[in-house]
A protein has these predicted regions:
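Short, contiguous alpha-helical
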Residues: 55-96, 144-200, 239
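C-terminal interaction segments
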Residues: 227-273
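Acidic interhelical loop/turn segments
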Residues: 47-58, 127-154
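Short linear/disordered segments characteristic of secreted peptide precursors
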Residues: 8-14
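Short, helix-capping/interhelical loops that line the mouth of catalytic, cofactor-
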Residues: 23-30, 77-134
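Basic, Lys/Arg-rich alpha-helical nucleic-acid-recognition elements, primarily the DNA-binding modules
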Residues: 27-62, 67-70
Length: 273
């Protein structure tokens, strides 16, 4: 399951696009617009479900579709609180000796409710969260699960989580859920947190170049120094699925090269578990 965080703001400094590029107003706002669009896509799927379908088993282990949406609601409530007040105020923070997955699962089990209540709670929470992040000081970091993030980076994690859990919901339902250009934010997040993921696993935090084909099949999204010895290439959709642990790297068409490419592909994440 995981709670979606770019683990350290030092490794996930805000850009919304490529690391190292200046942030203009349009780039700053695009992440919020794209987060809203991703949430609206999920809302359309959920609005058509009957009560029985809410109880279907999702692709998130141990959770029904209603459980997944409840988790998203709880996470958005926490995001709204931190974007407004700068801290989680007793939300989904993790205590010593507890994993994020365990904390999230416990929170869901404590607050299960009827599907209509869960759906309405998520709708309120996601609207409040998006409004709070838009209104927040763009340069002032706020507390998130295991570190501090600027609001646009926080929004990127919310986009990553809604997209991945959207896959968890759409798959069992057989709902249409095509890849979109919004994956660029998620791919950026996955690449930007690679140094942390590598170092935590005891691997050298060496530069890794990612060259990813966008969903339109024409654009190529490039992250990382062009002269990096290690690289990952392939479809952006597969890269994002691997980072979300929705696809085994060995079953993807992604190619890793150089001394650290294979380790980077194995360890890439858009969240901390």
């Amino acid at each position: 399951m995981g709670l979606w965080v770019p683990v350290e703001d030092a490794l996930a400094e805000e850009s919304g696009l490529l690391a190292g590029r200046p942030v203009c107003h349009s780039a700053w706002m695009s992440i919020f617009d794209d987060l809203g669009a991703e949430q609206e896509r999920l809302e359309k799927i959920l609005s058509g479900l009957d009560e029985a379908q809410w109880g279907w088993v999702s692709a998130a282990q141990g959770w029904t579709i209603a459980d997944v949406v409840l988790h998203l609601a709880q996470s958005e409530e926490a995001a709204a609180a931190t974007a407004t007040h700068g801290n989680l105020r007793g939300g989904l923070g993790v205590v010593a000796g507890e994993t994020m997955d365990a904390r999230a699962d416990a929170a869901v089990r404590m607050e299960r409710a009827a599907p209509a209540e869960v759906f309405a709670r998520w709708q309120r929470a996601r609207q409040a969260s998006l409004a709070a992040m838009r209104a927040a000081d763009p340069d002032l970091p706020v507390q998130w699960m295991v570190g501090t993030l600027k609001p646009a980076t926080l929004a990127t994690t919310r986009l990553a989580e809604h997209w991945a859990h959207g896959l968890d919901i759409a798959g069992p339902l057989g709902a249409d859920f095509p890849d979109t250009a919004r994956l660029r934010h998620i791919a950026w997040l996955a690449h930007r947190t690679l140094p942390y993921a590598l170092s935590v696993a005891g691997e050298p935090a060496a530069p890794v170049r990612c060259e990813l084909t966008a969903p339109d099949g024409e654009q190529v999204w490039r992250f990382g120094p062009p002269d990096a010895e290690s690289a990952i290439t392939g479809a952006a959709g597969e890269f994002c699925r691997v980072a979300a642990q929705r696809l085994d790297p060995a079953r993807s068409g992604l190619a890793a090269s150089g001394p650290h490419g294979a380790a980077a592909l194995r360890l890439v994440r858009t969240y901390a578990a």
